[in-house]
Amino acid sequence: MRMKFFSDNAATVHPHVWAAMQAADAPDTGYDGDTLSRRLDDAFSDLFGKRATALWVATGTAANCLALAAMVPPWGGVVCHREAHIETDEGGAPGFYTHGAKLILAEGDAAKITPATINAALGLIRAGVHQVQPHAISITQSTEYGRVYTPGEVAAIETLAS
């Protein structure tokens, strides 16, 4: 099978995924009250150790930007690489879904940010109400260049964010 890494809006689904979707296609309660949604909520609750609810969305853009909107106020900022997916491929969706949050662009090799490059971007921001203050850090996994963050790299960014 030839692999093509299209947008989630244009790519075809793998035959195994399609078969699973067809097997799950049965009448049920809608609006998150169905059996599959409850099973997914239970699986996430077990994984995170507290009650969690999954939000089903149709596209990756909606998933990315709704997640940002849940974390970042309209007056806040999201630190990301200047070639991060949310900067280069989501159009104006991050600002739209967050009602105005700004992307704070950091540098880094092959579209990967590090604690050092994040701190460099943050060092350009003055404290106070006249500049957007950071509220989240976003990484693209894998990057637009196909590079992957290691668990240690993600942990180092998480430590900085904490």
Model regions: which residues?
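N-terminal amphipathic/basic leader segments beginning at the initiator methionine
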Residues: 1-20
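Structural motif
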Residues: 3-4, 52-56, 76-78, 102-104, ...
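Conserved N-terminal alpha-helix of the aminotransferase class I/II PLP-enzyme fold
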Residues: 14-60, 82-83, 88, 93
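Glycine-rich loop at the start of a catalytic domain that most often binds anionic cofactors/ligands
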Residues: 66-75, 93
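Glycine/threonine-rich beta-strand-loop-alpha-helix active-site module
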Residues: 76-91, 95-98, 111, 116
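PLP-dependent aminotransferase-class I/II
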Residues: 98-144, 148-156
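A generic structural signal for well-ordered alpha-helical segments
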Residues: 160-161
